[in-house]
UniProtKB/Swiss-Prot annotation:
Belongs to the camello family. Residues 55-206 form the N-acetyltransferase domain. One of its GO terms (molecular function) is N-acetyltransferase activity. InterPro entries: Acyl_CoA_acyltransferase, GNAT_dom, NAT_camello-type. Signal peptide: none annotated. Gene3D superfamilies: 3.40.630.30. Probable acetyltransferase. This is Probable N-acetyltransferase 14. It comes from Bos taurus (Bovine). Its main location: membrane. It is found in: Membrane. Pfam families: Acetyltransf_1. SUPFAM superfamilies: Acyl-CoA N-acyltransferases (Nat) (SSF55729).
Length: 206
């Protein structure tokens, strides 16, 4: 499917369940890889080993003492990712959420935006997900182009001296990172845990 066969419009109320499932599926595709990346860093391994050693004095089962800290850490990380990216955001100053729709009416992607935390920060993508059945068909690029146009219009309406768009990407989402770099975005920051990156932020001056 070529990008020209796509349109982007605001999400309708009856599309909420479908869009929510799409967001959850998108998070599920990356959460295991993010958890594996985070929990195999040396500081995380040291903390897990210390927790397991402590639990051995409390629990009768060596296997349970070994696995329980890992299970709890993975569960906490997955819940955090789902809360951040796997739910519908509240309506923001930039409108939306928006959906990408095929000519047949099938919803194949979702996008949400929010203003930056301070003046000059530009706009931020808070949700960007494409149905697994429609990936590598230009849907992500079409949504990104729409996000850029909204960010420009919002910056002009707010009297901002420049338009800028920031897109956070989970460290394991190599496909999204490659798409952004191909569209002129540059990695400018990151955040994570214990000094290790879990999410990179890409930005572009529009």
């Amino acid at each position: 499917m070529a990008p020209s066969h796509l349109s982007v419009r605001e999400m309708r109320e009856d599309e909420k369940p479908l869009v929510l499932e799409m967001l959850k599926a998108g998070v599920k595709d990356t959460e295991n890889r993010v958890a594996l990346h985070a929990l195999t860093r040396p500081p995380a391994l040291l903390l897990l080993a210390a927790a397991s050693s402590g639990l051995r004095f409390v629990l009768a089962s060596f296997a349970l003492a070994l696995l329980l800290p890992v299970f709890l850490a993975v569960a906490a990380m997955k819940l955090g990712l789902r809360a951040r990216w796997g739910s519908l955001p509240p309506p923001g100053g930039l409108g939306g959420p928006w959906v990408a729709v095929r000519g047949s009416g099938d919803v194949c992607g979702v996008l949400a935006l929010a203003p930056g935390s301070s003046a000059g920060d530009g706009a931020r993508v808070t949700r960007l997900s494409v149905s697994r059945w429609h990936r590598r068909r230009g849907v992500g690029r079409r949504l990104l182009a729409f996000a850029e146009s909204r960010a420009r219009a919002w910056a002009g309406g707010m009297g901002e001296p420049r338009a800028r768009l920031v897109v956070p990407v989970a460290v394991a989402a190599w496909g999204v990172a490659g798409m952004l770099e191909g569209c002129g975005y540059q990695a400018e920051g990151s955040w994570g845990c214990m000094g290790y990156t879990l999410v990179r932020e890409f930005s572009k001056e529009l």
